[in-house]
């Protein structure tokens, strides 16, 4: 097979794709990590567990895998709550970072020591009130707690969910009370 003259091929990889998980325990503690290495010359800060998607990996699978790899905590995907698009990331490429709400299936931490310096369950109010935590991290945690987000959906004509992922907005937004209430379901 040969490409035709009009074929559109990107000249190079243009984006990094990553995902982080907002994981809230039954006792209103947020699963957080501190990486071993800072970014942009800054000291490592507490943040959500997460990382890069692997080639061919779906978003929902990737965030569950990343949280498990970094923390040892098993989770189940609930929803996509927000994302950030940032230009000028590594090597001048753009970065898309998805924030997902996950439900913990286990709570025992087994920290991955190659990349992670510290991992713990932190009271959510302590996280939000901590001056040493970035405003971005606080903002995305609030987004994860205050809206129900978008849930996976099957779209007619696209039955293979391994090939394509679709997320649709839920019809209500009742915040933290709803998030806490759904844990048992």
Regions found by a protein language model. Give the residues of each.
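Nudix hydrolase/Nudix homology domain
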Residues: 39-45, 55, 114-185
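N-terminal strand-loop-strand
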Residues: 6-48, 75, 79
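Short, catalytically relevant binding-site loops at active-site mouths
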Residues: 37-39, 53-55, 82-87
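Active-site-adjacent beta-strand/loop module that shapes the phosphate/pyrophosphate-binding cleft
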Residues: 5-7, 25-27, 86-109, 124, ...
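Short, conserved, surface-exposed binding loops centered on an aromatic residue
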Residues: 11-13, 22-23, 69-74, 88-92, ...
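Hydrophobic pocket/interface hotspot
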Residues: 33, 63, 67, 119
């Amino acid at each position: 097979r040969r490409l035709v003259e009009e074929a559109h091929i990107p000249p190079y990889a243009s984006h990094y794709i990553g995902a982080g998980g907002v994981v809230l325990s039954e006792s209103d503690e947020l699963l957080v990590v501190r990486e071993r290495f800072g970014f942009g010359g800054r000291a490592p800060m507490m943040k959500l567990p997460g990382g890069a998607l692997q080639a061919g990996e779906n978003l929902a699978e990737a965030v569950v895998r990343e949280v498990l790899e970094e923390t040892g905590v098993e989770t189940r995907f609930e929803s996509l709550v927000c994302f950030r698009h940032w230009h000028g990331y590594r090597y001048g490429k753009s970065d898309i970072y998805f924030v997902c709400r996950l439900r913990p299936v286990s709570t025992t931490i087994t920290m991955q020591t190659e990349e992670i310096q510290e991992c713990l369950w932190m009271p959510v109010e302590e996280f939000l009130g901590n001056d040493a935590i970035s405003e971005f991290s606080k903002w995305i945690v609030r987004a994860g707690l205050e809206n129900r987000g978008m849930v996976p959906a099957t779209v007619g004509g696209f039955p293979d969910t391994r090939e394509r992922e679709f997320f649709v907005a839920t019809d209500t937004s009742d915040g933290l009370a709803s998030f806490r209430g759904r844990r048992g379901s």
